[in-house]
Amino acid sequence: MVDDAGAAEVLGDEWRPAWSLDRLLRAPLPPPRIRTRPWWFPVQELRDPLVFYLEAWLADAIFGPDRAIIPEIEWMSQVLLTVDVVNSGDLVEISIFGWPRVQNRVKSVLLSLASWHRKHRARAEKMKQLEEFLKTGGTGPQTPEHPVA
């Protein structure tokens, strides 16, 4: 008999420690890949999606890390969105299903949000560099821009 400290469970042909199985069981489930079409979405608009790509960190910032905001965006804009990670993991593929005019509007909104998040991140990095510079006491070559005569 195995004591609790050395407890293990058999999964198929593998032995896994019980603590990793517990951790796996407590992890949140990924969202289901198959969804039913909402009653308000016309079937004919599923034929021609508008597809574009964004960096994965931008998709996390826009849609949330668990993509929880997607249903709200779909309801408010009357489109269907799919956000899938591309092979490398650095990019996500965003597909927008709906009327062409609405597809373009939603794409424009999402790209505007992406631009805002990029600028916000760049500003945060500059602020961090400035803080580091000020912490070091501002040592370095300092030449006045306008020398006083």
Curated annotation (Swiss-Prot):
Domain of life: Eukaryota
Sorted UniProt keywords: Cytoplasm, Nucleus
GO molecular function: RNA binding; structural constituent of cytoplasmic lattice
Main location: cytoplasm
KH domain: residues covered: 49-110
UniProt-listed Gene3D superfamilies: K Homology domain, type 1
Any coiled-coil regions, as ranges: none
InterPro entries per UniProt: KH_dom_type_1_sf, KHDC1, MOEP19_KH-like
GO cellular component entries: cell cortex; cytoplasm; cytoplasmic lattice; nucleus; protein-containing complex
Nucleus among keywords: yes
GO biological process, any: regulation of establishment of protein localization
Cellular location(s): Cytoplasm; Nucleus
Pfam families: MOEP19
Subunit record text: Component of the subcortical maternal complex (SCMC), at least composed of NLRP5, KHDC3, OOEP, and TLE6. Within the complex, interacts with NLRP5, KHDC3 and TLE6. As part of the SCMC interacts with the SCMC-associated protein NLRP4F. The SCMC may facilitate translocation of its components between the nuclear and cytoplasmic compartments. Forms a scaffold complex with KHDC3/FILIA, and interacts with BLM and TRIM25 at DNA replication forks.
Family named by the database record: Belongs to the KHDC1 family.
Free-text comment on this protein's domains from its UniProt entry: Contains an atypical KH domain with amino acid changes at critical sites, suggesting that it may not bind RNA.
Protein purpose: Component of the subcortical maternal complex (SCMC), a multiprotein complex that plays a key role in early embryonic development. The SCMC complex is a structural constituent of cytoplasmic lattices, which consist in fibrous structures found in the cytoplasm of oocytes and preimplantation embryos. They are required to store maternal proteins critical for embryonic development, such as proteins that control epigenetic reprogramming of the preimplantation embryo, and prevent their degradation or activation.
Descriptive protein name: Oocyte-expressed protein
UniProt source species: Canis lupus familiaris (Dog)
